[in-house]
Amino acid sequence: MTTALYLPEENIDMIAATSVLQQQAADIRTRTINWASYMQSQMISEEDYKAISALDKSRASFLAQNSSQVVKTLLNLVSHLSKDSTIQYILVLLDDLLQEDRSRVDLFHDTAGKLKQCIWGPFLNLLNRQDGFIVNMSSRILAKFACWGHETMPKSDLNFYLQFLKDQLASNNNEYIQSVARCLQMMLRVDEYRFAFVGVDGISTLIRILSTRVNFQVQYQLIFCLWVLTFNPLLAAKMNKFSVIPILADILSDCAKEKVTRIILAVFRNLIEKPEDSSVAKDHCIAMVQCKVLKQLSILEQRRFDDEDITADVEYLSEKLQNSVQDLSSFDEYATEVRSGRLEWSPVHKSAKFWRENAQRLNEKNYELLRILVHLLETSKDAIILSVACFDIGEYVRHYPRGKHVLEQLGGKQIVMQHLGHEDPNVRYEALLAVQKLMVHNWEYLGKQLEKENENQKQGAAPIAGKA
């Protein structure tokens, strides 16, 4: 049995009148198919001919009296006919039947079971067709079969289908992207399907698309997908590992559409409310503060919204984030900034007291923060991020005696040195300082050695070389 999350119907309507799929479906409904010619050429049986002809003439009454035959006929036609225009017509007819009455999904499941036919196979096969309408209408029907009935999609088929949806979302200039997103919105309302989507690296795909410029409708649909994922406490706890908060904070700051604002606030609220570990909720609050969400909330507080949910969420988030700021230690602030990947010259970086007290904490959780700094040095193109990362690594080595050894083990020393030739002068400068710190084991030891050297020179003794 599928366990679908209850959501207001206005949020999950299946008919988007402006979508390409619906516009084409409206044209296809007006077609007349010559079923007699199919029977005469023995491409369909007489039984199927009578059923589909009767269904064309009086859908509701014939279906009510001959439901099993209708299901059998439609599955036969989808499986055995190949002409694009005919398949398009059958798919629209079938989709309309399901849209008119959701209980018909179970009718299809039950009848297919009695006939020992696989209900998934014919439609999964159609996903490989060249015709975009056939592919996406088949996908839409699969989503309804998977979400509206008592049977869930088998695991192997599920992984194939979710991978298909993910690939379609990521496809450049896909005119059916709203329809693809609509199917995913449906699928992720079922808890059993959420982990499977994460398993095909689906969240990363959503975030990657949201980080590009997409129209507000697709933006809303994809954030909706993130929202329904956050209703699962385990997924809500893991969500910001994918940088969900920074991406949504950016969208919120530029957002002009109320529906997009509403769904982002709902995601943020779930990221605080749903995780069972309070420390995770705290981390999410800190991440939101780091991403300047409080500033956006203060702007939203000045606006009037007809939607009471927005007002309630703004009040809730403002209170939670204000409380987290009061409890925020300098290391919490630093760790959140590093995890966000958005390094800037915030005060903690230049604080000698901070590094004296906290350098060793970069070793926590198997050197998590240090690994992130090295990764940013390796992957970021932003000069400020690179400069700050070089500086932080230098301070870590300076204040933690074994820092040089640890950094070498992580491959960080070589990466820092590569930036000595960076095109940006600030990056070159910070990389040079970091390398100088890397060449010395212990700054206090070096200072003492220099004092001894000066003393010996005064006494005429040979100088003592500092360790490099």
Curated annotation (Swiss-Prot):
Q: Which GO terms describe its molecular function?
A: proton-transporting ATPase activity, rotational mechanism
Keyword set includes Ion transport: yes
A GO cellular component term found in this entry reads: vacuolar proton-transporting V-type ATPase, V1 domain
Record's keyword annotation contains Ion transport: yes
Q: Spell out where the chain crosses the membrane.
A: none
Supply the Pfam families for this chain.
V-ATPase_H_C, V-ATPase_H_N
Keyword annotations: Hydrogen ion transport, Ion transport, Transport
What InterPro entries does the entry give?
ARM-like, ARM-type_fold, ATPase_V1-cplx_hsu, ATPase_V1-cplx_hsu_C, ATPase_V1-cplx_hsu_C_sf
**GO biological-process terms attached to the record:** determination of adult lifespan; lysosomal lumen acidification; proton transmembrane transport
Question: Briefly, what is this protein's role?
Answer: Subunit of the V1 complex of vacuolar(H+)-ATPase (V-ATPase), a multisubunit enzyme composed of a peripheral complex (V1) that hydrolyzes ATP and a membrane integral complex (V0) that translocates protons. V-ATPase is responsible for acidifying and maintaining the pH of intracellular compartments and in some cell types, is targeted to the plasma membrane, where it is responsible for acidifying the extracellular environment. Subunit H is essential for V-ATPase activity, but not for the assembly of the complex.
What's this protein's family per the entry? Belongs to the V-ATPase H subunit family.
Complexes and interactors: V-ATPase is a heteromultimeric enzyme made up of two complexes: the ATP-hydrolytic V1 complex and the proton translocation V0 complex. The V1 complex consists of three catalytic AB heterodimers that form a heterohexamer, three peripheral stalks each consisting of EG heterodimers, one central rotor including subunits D and F, and the regulatory subunits C and H. The proton translocation complex V0 consists of the proton transport subunit a, a ring of proteolipid subunits c9c'', rotary subunit d, subunits e and f, and the accessory subunits VhaAC45 and ATP6AP2.
Instruction: Give the protein's recorded name.
Output: V-type proton ATPase subunit H
Q: Which organism is it from?
A: Drosophila melanogaster (Fruit fly)
What's the source species' lineage? Eukaryota, Metazoa, Ecdysozoa, Arthropoda, Hexapoda
